[in-house]
């Protein structure tokens, strides 16, 4: 009896510690800051000054570092997630907007919007390895789960570029709709979901054929077509449901990831931009740029359960477990 009680208490302590450790990081584009939110209480813990115009942010696989695109400083800042202090920088090209990290945490791929390049940085040495010429105004970057491929989207060229991570060369170009913003690999590496902001669509690309297998469009009663702008994308690990941020439409589209049918639209804050799951995928967090908040969505019930005020013009979001 005593041993069972001790084990139960230890389990409770471990669970509590894990919950307390979860933090949500939000980049505030016009606030030049990162807002840190407690993942359990959903209260703001800190607002941390960073570089100019922070946009894309990504968490290291081990959760120790948050990487921040300080776009107007032409650099990537490194934040220690335990101290919330900036501890270093990484080289990039001009106007870095989004980046992604290899699954083993050793390589970073950065889209530099103003020089039409993807910069490859070794995260161990913190030195650049190469610059890869891509299309005009590169934006989205997504690394495959096996680390063998990077997909970069170029906004003006309207293409998704497949880059071999061994050779750093483009092997395939896939034409998508106007102004592609984001590239998301499914957990099994079978598909890449590419959002097109002005096109208002998501192209689902088959990784085996490098062809578009389906194109998802969105229609919201009472919302002008030009306001429906697809931006951030997330697909759950089991490839059952997908979520698409629709920008000025102020909606998240819920999509059946098998049939590609839109099931529902969730009303969130104004100009919803980027998305991130909680590690257990029970919650989805959205950045709402014009209303200066994030929305918290219960993934099971498909309901918005809370709005959390953050800094001016929230852009990116990342979660530490």
Predicted regions and their residues:
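Predominantly soluble domains enriched in secretory-pathway, periplasmic, or organellar proteins
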Residues: 4, 11, 17-321
């Amino acid at each position: 009896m005593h041993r069972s009680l001790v084990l139960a208490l230890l389990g409770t302590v471990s669970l509590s510690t894990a919950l307390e450790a979860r933090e949500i990081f939000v980049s505030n584009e016009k606030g030049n800051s990162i807002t840190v939110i407690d993942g359990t209480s959903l209260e703001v813990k800190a607002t941390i000054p960073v570089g100019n115009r922070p946009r894309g942010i990504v968490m290291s696989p081990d959760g120790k570092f948050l990487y921040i695109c300080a776009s107007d400083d032409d650099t990537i800042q490194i934040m220690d997630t335990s101290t919330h202090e900036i501890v270093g920088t990484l080289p990039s090209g001009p106007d870095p907007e989004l980046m992604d990290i290899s699954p083993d945490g050793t390589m970073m791929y950065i889209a530099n919007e103003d020089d039409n390049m993807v910069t490859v940085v070794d995260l161990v040495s913190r030195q650049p390895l190469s610059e890869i010429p891509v299309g005009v105004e590169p934006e989205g970057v997504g690394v495959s789960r096996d680390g063998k491929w990077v997909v970069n989207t170029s906004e003006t060229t309207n293409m998704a570029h497949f880059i071999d991570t061994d050779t750093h060369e483009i092997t395939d170009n896939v034409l998508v709709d106007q102004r592609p913003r984001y590239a998301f690999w499914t957990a099994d590496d079978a598909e890449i979901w590419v959002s097109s902001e002005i096109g208002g669509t998501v192209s689902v690309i088959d990784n085996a054929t490098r062809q578009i297998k389906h194109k998802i469009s969105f229609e919201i009663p009472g919302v002008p077509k030009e306001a429906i702008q697809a931006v951030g994308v997330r697909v759950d690990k089991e490839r059952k449901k997908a979520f698409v941020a629709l920008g000025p439409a102020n909606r998240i589209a819920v999509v059946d990831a098998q049939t590609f049918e839109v099931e529902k639209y969730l009303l969130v804050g104004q100009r919803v931009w980027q998305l991130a799951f909680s590690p257990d995928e029970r919650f989805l967090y959205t950045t709402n740029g014009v209303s200066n908040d994030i929305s918290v969505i219960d993934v099971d019930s498909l309901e918005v359960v809370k709005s959390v005020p953050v800094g001016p013009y929230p852009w990116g979001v990342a979660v530490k477990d």
